[in-house]
């Protein structure tokens, strides 16, 4: 792999025609070759690279920001310079009897961060355990699981605005978070996140364990430790256990986690569906809306374990698409399976599923049409 460390201004030869293999840098294990990869281990390196990039008109190509590769669908050939933020570090910036503020660099593994904070007695992220990827990518999707979203604990994001070559500190409000959405997702390849600030609490009795099977499993962990009620560590271990049972390890069976978003429909539409399918799974949402479990829809459409070779839904969790031809399958294989699943679900339930992972075009731009190549 061609990997340029920007400890000094980038020399032209590091942006040559030597291709970089990204097949092993995306958890879906899709075959992908890129023009060049630049690995950034601190913010100064980014400033230096951008100064060179601005001057080097001969080799200039589009920029594409790639974090842990856990939520992207890459093209077979990526005609772009790939920027990989790999800054590391965690530090406490403020602390009281009730909360602790921490700043986390973009290259920190997300799950490792969750485990670390719980071990330190800093709580709020435990429901987000075992979500793949790096911390810098978490705000892009406003990651969420088991009743918690990233925005619940996020204070700020420090990010580089690539078009203007300026640094910005964005508050949670500035990030314009929504369900699996943010300003970073809506403005792709515009921002490079270098660090994220969180405010976590220190009250070990404050837990959210009422979602799905979490309460039962967390209570089991608490009982084993001689406690009457679950603590945050119990919730974290419960969620890890549940996710490991339901979700395949990308290292063993390539996938990019939940492939489809849970659709949100009007309550009256959900009530109509419920009259025909009493077991349908839904969760009340604001503004008279209901969030429907996409995995349930896919399974009831007869697609659990189904798809189009070599991309299939997982046998234990229909929400996950898996790649049975790692490093060979392409984005077009995923597109075919995705269309088949979306069309089948719509035909049965009249609900349109939406893809969660980011669709990357050949020039590094982000596409929203599954037929874009």
Swiss-Prot record:
Write the protein's name.
Answer: UDP-N-acetylenolpyruvoylglucosamine reductase
Cofactor(s) named in the record: FAD
Q: What keywords are annotated for this sequence in UniProt? A: Cell cycle, Cell division, Cell shape, Cell wall biogenesis/degradation, Cytoplasm, FAD, Flavoprotein, NADP, Oxidoreductase, Peptidoglycan synthesis
User: Species name for this entry?
Assistant: Psychrobacter cryohalolentis (strain ATCC BAA-1226 / DSM 17306 / VKM B-2378 / K5)
- Pfam families (alphabetical): FAD_binding_4, MurB_C
Pathway given in the UniProt record = Cell wall biogenesis; peptidoglycan biosynthesis
PANTHER family the record matches: UDP-N-ACETYLENOLPYRUVOYLGLUCOSAMINE REDUCTASE
Residue ranges of domain FAD-binding PCMH-type in the record: 30-203
Biological role stated in the UniProt entry: Cell wall formation.
- Recorded family membership: Belongs to the MurB family.
CC annotations in GO: cytosol
Q: Taxonomy-wise, where does this protein's organism fall, top ranks first?
A: Bacteria, Pseudomonadati, Pseudomonadota, Gammaproteobacteria, Moraxellales
Q: Active site: which residues?
A: 180, 258 (proton donor), 356
Domain of life the protein comes from: Bacteria
Is the keyword Cell division in the record? Answer: yes
Q: Where is this gene product found? A: Cytoplasm
User: Which Gene3D superfamilies does the record match to this protein?
Assistant: 3.30.465.10, UDP-N-acetylenolpyruvoylglucosamine reductase, C-terminal domain, Uridine Diphospho-n-acetylenolpyruvylglucosamine Reductase, domain 2
- NCBIfam families, per the entry: murB (TIGR00179), PRK00046.1 (NF000755)
